[in-house]
Amino acid sequence: MQSNSQIKRVFNQIARPLLAAGIMAVIIGCSAFEPEYGECPPIFAAKGAEESYLVGSKLGQIIKIRFNGISGQCVARDGYTDARLYINVLMRRDLTTGSNIEQAEFYITAAIIDETETVVSRETFLEEANFRDSMDTSQPDIIKRLDIPDGHRVVLALGRAAE
C-alpha cells in the first residue's frame, strides 16, 4: 500500500504537466481567433469635403469640423476586404458666443469607388459629438466597418450626398 506522500508525488508528477499543457492550449487557442490583418485598399478623404461647418443643437454655435486622422485595419476575404475604419474628427467652436455644453450631429459618407472612378455604393453614418463646458474643441473617435470589394477604394466626406 502506498503512503499519502507517494500518492501526492505521483499526482503532482501527472498534474503539473497536464496543467502546463492546458495553459498552453488556451494561449494557442486564443491566438488562433485573431484574424490575419493585411494591407487595406486606399482610404482617403475627398478633396473639398474634408472640412465643413455645422450648427450646434443646444446653443446654435457655428462649429468647424474636419478630418483629423483616418486609418484602417483590414482582413482579406473571398472577393472583398473586411475593413474597420478608425476616423478621428476635430471640431472647434468659438467660446465668445457661449461656453456651456454644446452638442452637434454630423454625417460622414463613405463612397466605394471602382477602377473606372464610378461610385458603386455609398454608406452614410450619422454621428454625434459633444463639447464639454468651457471646452472649445472636441475630438470624437469613430469606428465603422465596411466591406470593400477587391479592386475598389474608399473616399470619405463630411456631409451626405444630395438625394
Where are these regions (language model features)?
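Generic short beta-strand segments
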Residues: 68-71, 86-92, 161
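Helix-rich interaction surfaces within compact, conserved domain-sized segments
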Residues: 110, 116-163
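Bacterial N-terminal signal peptides that target proteins for export
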Residues: 3-19
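Post-signal peptide N-terminal segment of mature Sec-exported envelope proteins
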Residues: 38-59
